[in-house]
């Protein structure tokens, strides 16, 4: 009933599961058994009204947090796309830039089924000032977390595998990656969860967050709200900068791997 009446919930399950029935069932099971879901309230609502429509934010919270009170990536359906490997503030957005490039119709396709060559991806990211080591590390993580997939269907789970075989020749974004890019990163619940797992390299901002004066008064929000606003502004600024640099008449930005 919830899937029939809540299109956003249906979109979430289909895209996060990648169309895999087993993963979809796991998402539902995780929601039903999550300590972050108010089960008593749901049972009471069903008792009083005879039905309960699961809201997207409630279902997504269970997928984000699982059995924990704070985000733990290895046990979550979500990936922290703002994580870094090196102490570089710009790197917070490297995973998003890779996802954005792989979903861009203007990128040179290596194959007819949406794969983009590794060379094109690395060249594009290097034009933004990122090193091959940074780019490779993020590609490896995005592949392991199934936000992108390689033409060779390798998960790149170990550094030894990369040393022995190198990176695959081409990649494309998955529905899970597209959902992160086009939906999750603009939602407060996702950004709030990631704020506990994302280092802050800006000394001024870190001092401001740590200052008691920052949060005095009822009009001040949770510290993660400031990080949320900062991430949203920075992400949109980077996206617009990239879009402007590529802009041409008739250009499109829809993706074959976009959300359903």
Indicate residue ranges for each PLM-predicted region.
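The catalytic "switch" region of P-loop NTPases
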Residues: 1-6
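A short helix-loop-helix "switch/interaction" segment in the helical subdomain of ASCE P-loop NTPases
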Residues: 8-22
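A short, terminal or domain-edge coil/loop segment
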Residues: 20, 54-58, 210-218
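Alpha-helix N-cap/helix-initiation sites
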Residues: 21-24, 132
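Winged-helix-like regulatory helical subdomains adjacent to P-loop NTPase cores
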Residues: 23-119
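Terminal-proximal interaction/regulatory segments of ATP-powered molecular machines
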Residues: 106-260
